Curated annotation (Swiss-Prot):
The keyword Isomerase applies. This is Phosphopentomutase. PANTHER family: PHOSPHOPENTOMUTASE. Disulfide bonds: none annotated. Its main location: cytoplasm. It is found in: Cytoplasm. It comes from Legionella pneumophila (strain Lens). Pathway: Carbohydrate degradation; 2-deoxy-D-ribose 1-phosphate degradation; D-glyceraldehyde 3-phosphate and acetaldehyde from 2-deoxy-alpha-D-ribose 1-phosphate: step 1/2. It catalyses: 2-deoxy-alpha-D-ribose 1-phosphate = 2-deoxy-D-ribose 5-phosphate; alpha-D-ribose 1-phosphate = D-ribose 5-phosphate. One of its GO terms (biological process) is nucleotide metabolic process. It comes from the Bacteria.
Length: 407
């Protein structure tokens, strides 16, 4: 075994529209560049938090802006003013058909999603009548609220009071392959919410739905707030992923945040939950202090997507990026001689775009560590190149089927 791997997934941090973006209604999307330009125009100031241009010195030093320029061709920054990147840098193109969390993560771990997910139409009462009636029956519910495409925070404010009064959970979806259930932790019960999500998971399988998501909230009308007790019930990957092969090989696979949920808890040896990007970074640092040789520490930083991308909060996204960037030196000092850190994303979610959905984009691929020299790895034709490179570095005995190593 040689060294350890740490993967940091900046959920939704795309760096330029993919060639097929127009098929998804996402032509021109660019999460990073549009945030960068909004900051440059002075549109992302937050009193007491951030002001002026986007400042990401650590990510820039690892090649983020070089990768973004290669991805989109947009001259948003003068590369001549930047130092030569200190690690591997490039961008990757998604082969999976979706632009969702499971597709991006599974492909990254060696399993592109080549089948079509099921989706619910964007219309009132969007769920099949058979599905809802069976859900109500099996869960012994008085009914449901919502039944439409919606932003989770908006529908929570819209229907939260009625939910508490009637005991009916709020069910909704989006452009992703999801069946989401929101309920008040005290009035409805957190465990009860989890229980009905498990029932829903079985019911939506026939519709090829990727995830059932529990969306608990607390508070009173006018001040409802989501809690950190979200739980994703994902359909399992169709093939063994990098995580499965590592676990079978006797390695430690430490899943932080929602990683275990994304892989349906397969291939994971340890699960660590944390709420919020900074708590997730703290958990990552703690794991890296004790992770043995040959192990994988895998963290998803969900706030970029759920708190800022979907909510089209450009300033909040910029601030979150700067907070993340500032923590990277804390991770670097914990690295052992043969360790590698991979920074990537799973899709885009351009906060300057209309609507509230993900955007079809390239993702950054940045790799650094004590023994990693500067190298432009160019365009990677599949997210699975990340998994294949990790498999090579960790000397995994079972090679992945997809992807080409760039090490």
């Amino acid at each position: 075994m040689t060294g350890r791997i740490c993967i940091l997934v900046m959920d939704s941090f795309g760096i330029g529209a993919s060639l097929d973006a127009a098929r998804y209604g996402d032509a021109g999307a660019n999460t990073l560049v549009h945030i960068y330009e909004a900051c440059k125009r002075g549109e992302c100031d937050i009193e007491g938090a951030r002001k002026g241009p986007l400042m990401l010195p650590n990510l820039a030093g690892k090649g983020l802006y070089h990768a973004a320029m290669a991805s989109s061709g947009l001259p948003f920054i003068d590369l001549a003013t930047l130092a030569i990147p200190s690690g591997y840098y490039g961008y990757a193109v998604e082969q999976s058909l979706g632009k969702d969390t499971p597709s991006g993560h599974w492909e990254m771990a060696g399993v592109p999603v080549t089948f079509e997910w099921g989706y619910f139409p964007d219309k009132p009462y969007c769920f099949p009548e058979e599905l809802i009636s069976e859900f109500i029956k099996q869960c012994n519910l008085p009914g449901v609220l919502g039944e439409k495409h919606a932003s989770g925070t908006i529908i929570m404010d819209e229907l939260g009071e009625e939910h508490i009064r009637t005991g009916k959970p709020i069910v909704y979806t989006s452009a992703d392959s999801v069946f989401q259930i929101a309920a008040h932790e005290e009035a409805f019960g957190l465990q009860r919410l989890y229980d009905i999500c498990k029932i829903a998971r079985n019911l939506v399988d026939k519709y090829q739905i990727g995830r059932v998501i529990a969306r608990p909230f607390t508070g009173k009308p006018g001040s409802f707030k989501r809690t950190g007790n979200r739980k994703d019930y994902a359909t399992p990957p169709p093939e063994k992923t990098l995580l499965d092969f590592l676990k079978e090989d006797g390695r430690e696979v430490i899943a932080i945040g929602k990683i275990a949920d994304i892989y349906a808890h397969q291939g994971v040896t340890q699960e660590i939950k944390a709420d919020g990007n900074m708590a997730l970074f703290d958990a990552t640092l703690s794991a890296m202090k004790t992770a043995p040789q040959g192990s994988l520490v895998f963290t998803n930083f969900v706030d970029f997507d759920s708190s800022y991308g979907h909510r089209r909060d450009i300033a909040g996204y910029a601030h979150a990026l700067e907070q993340f960037d500032a923590r990277l030196p804390e991770l670097e000092v914990l690295l052992q001689p043969n360790d590698m850190v991979f920074i990537a994303a799973d899709h885009g979610c351009d906060p300057t775009f209309p609507g509230s959905d993900h955007t079809r984009e390239h993702i950054p691929v940045l790799v650094f560590g004590p023994q990693v020299n500067s190298k432009f790895i160019g365009r990677r034709d599949c997210f699975a190149d990340i998994g294949q490179s990790i498999a090579e570095h960790l000397q995994l005995s079972s090679p992945l089927t997809h992807g080409v190593s760039f090490l």
